[in-house]
Amino acid sequence: MNKGWLELESDPGLFTLLVEDFGVKGVQVEEIYDLQSKCPGPVYGFIFLFKWIEERRSRRKVSTLLDDTSVMEDEVVNNMFFAHQLIPNSCATHALLSVLLNCGGVHLGPTLSRIKEFTKGFSPESKGYAIGNAPELAKAHNSHARPEPRHLPEKQNGISAVRTMEAFHFVSYVPIKGRLFELDGLKVYPIDHGPWAEDEEWTDKARRVIMERIGLATAGEPYHDIRFNLMAVVPDRRLKYEGKLNILKMNRQTVLEALQQLIRVTQPELIQAQKSTDGQSTEETKSPAIKAPVSQESHRAHHGSHRSTTDLGAEPAGSLLRGPVLSAHNKSKPLPQNGGIVPAPASRLPAFLDNHNYAKSPMQEEEDLAAGVGRSRGVPPPAPDTDEEEEEETENVRRPLTPPGFKRRSSESLPPPPGPEPGVLAEKLKETQRDLCSPLSIKTGAPTAPHSQPSPTPSNESTDTASEIGSAFNSPLRSPLRSANPTRPSSPVTSHLSKVLFGEEEPLSRLDCVRYNRAVRELGPHISTGILHLSKDGYLSPLSRLDTGKVSPKSHKAEEPRESPEPDSERNRVTEAPQGEKFSPKELLALLKCVEAEISASEACLREELEKRKKFKIDDQRRTHNYDEFICAFISMLAQEGMLASLVEQNISVRRRQGVSIGRLHKQRKPDRRKRSRPYKAKRQ
């Protein structure tokens, strides 16, 4: 029982893989580098490594030293999972079990659930024997340890093997029933550090206790000693980012539906035009003379969809009219009622939505492009009614080479611009629904999208290890309200839309757009934590859960375009808007940009977590691999080539020149610095 347990290193990747081998799901281990910074997010417990003062850490005898903070009540001690360490080198597993088996809401798996149920009410000594009699724990423990040497070196005279080895020990800090406990398997009783204040978290008190302990051990110099290490047991961040991505994608679909509904409300005359063009498309597609130009134009549009938005904007308007004329048969049809997908060989989108994909992430767009899914382009029929914004849109489309600073704002005599149609976002919504139904997949080997945020830590995939990546506690995510920062690359979809609709890209990319944009200010904090709801009347509202479990929406309505109200400098927190408040298209586009920025940031964080798991496994394989066979084969090859003897002789001669004795270590004789009595001189000259 007490033989065969190996020492484990203090590495967060090792402990994360050990937790998975125990059968626990949804838990990982992170390393803490700064004790003065607050730990974001929930923390199940801390694992603290320090240098053990006694001669042997893995001794059978448990320390009997007691102090005022020791909890000696059997009822309290037996109701928590506190086990004596009766097995050498098992302190890492003891510390990890002390955290996992004392916190609720964790999927322990069959092995730990059976141990927790079996040892309920046992004494600490009995729980220690239960850990030693669990072969699953011993197997998982030793699978992540370095292999021990087969032949131990001979004991050298005059040197104590115990005193020369530095022993380290793991302990746990866990919150139990409102009090902070320190669980040390080499002590008889757990240590109670008391409750924490009402205005702080338990992690704040634990950090203070650990800092005081480090300060006492290092004579007041806590940051000049590397004999300590602190790790935190936290929820799995992969599950966190996956859930956040699902919520963001559903909210993106809701915003797109709000835009589509806004088009139907503001321009109802286009509904009849859409129906008439749909009827013409069914008749024209029957003739084979029209099918060939349509297929050629679709093929040409598919190859042209790979170009950037700058190239599309710089293309003259006359070039769009070359080739076969596509009148009305290549318009996108509205979304069918049964949820099916209507095949559109040459889908038509308006100018401000052309060649963009709302419903897919950058990595999924690459997959679609590789599969041959393309977008066709064409010129829509002009709408009879125009306003100032539509004239700006027409000017941007027909004069793409004009610099943004010299664009005309006044209304001029221009041809009627193409107006948005009711089926503008139908195809985008269908693709969004397919995206929501498909399982979430992140390609870790794919190149990073231009508008996705890279990892702040530079890394080389071939050489960096997981321990060099850093901790997630030191790199907090941006809040939704900060996603409009110009340092973050904007989405090509919303930037092109804002450039076409409003004449310039700057308003939606400036930092102060958060002040005057009501949609981002009021719905921005909810896009990654809650689901947005769109009613039939056009009210866009976040769903807030009440104590009864019901969901109540806070209504904000998307209505016809109008200027946003003046910013309120004193309004720093999200408040409930009055009933019937309306959002303009500019505000909805800004909200859409905020959602897309959060999706890009979450995908980058999820990709980074997956890369960390890969490097954890690489480090573990390097650590546990047995290199003895390779070394023996290499030495035998040197002996066969006749090079071994010369190398050994050369190495010995180098050591002799450096003054290092080859044989038995001799105790160096120190010079005698004692004061010697001088002979008394009787006579003085």
UniProtKB/Swiss-Prot annotation:
Site, as annotated: Important for enzyme activity: 184
Catalyzed reactions per annotation: Thiol-dependent hydrolysis of ester, thioester, amide, peptide and isopeptide bonds formed by the C-terminal Gly of ubiquitin (a 76-residue protein attached to proteins as an intracellular targeting signal)
Main localization (coarse): cytoplasm
Subcellular location: Cytoplasm; Nucleus
InterPro entries, A to Z: Papain-like_cys_pep_sf, Peptidase_C12_UCH, Peptidase_C12_UCH_sf, UCH_C
One Pfam family it belongs to: Peptidase_C12
Basic and acidic residues bias spans: 556-574
Family in the record: Belongs to the peptidase C12 family. BAP1 subfamily.
Protein name from the UniProt record: Ubiquitin carboxyl-terminal hydrolase BAP1
